[in-house]
């Protein structure tokens, strides 16, 4: 998210055939229509409000609003929380084109609300949050980070894990008997983000859609190199140091 440099802030197209990857809402309106049925059920039991976190191109928001209109269950407000100014502009353009008569129901937030009732929606958000790369070694648990080598190129570097990361890694390593040499990811950011809603959501539900595994499969010994993956122009690879800032870097959800 670094201004002008970060993947989500540099202005290049991310989604669709001209971008790096395709999400379900970009492929068909059926995804939004299906999600709308569940959103309607939740709103009828809580409040007619929606917050979508990380709304991408705005395609899902537009499809949801149109389907909820058809179901006669429009939200009083559809809020979008997105850190990228570039994506905010694209979301406004998408909704204005697809559902101009519903644009006045949409607002953009700069931070999480203190309290909220309704539906919190996030499609492929958690796998885009920062994750720590962890290595279990013979002599301890290490946090893998980035350094610059003698040639001036980015390379992996390790330092002993500490604090909350070490505690989480120790618990996982013990629970699943991870052998030395096992490497994987732990997203403290995803854990913290999810926990925040336990304090802020007074009535409603979180609807989180993403790629991932149950924890016992995420840390299975057949997945000893982790799940970190990069996407560039619809090609997947595992080198986060290639074309820095131009690749979508993701890790599956635990």
Feature-to-residue mapping (PLM):
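Rossmann-like AdoMet
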Residues: 1-53, 57-116, 134
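Class I S-adenosyl-L-methionine
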Residues: 107, 113-254
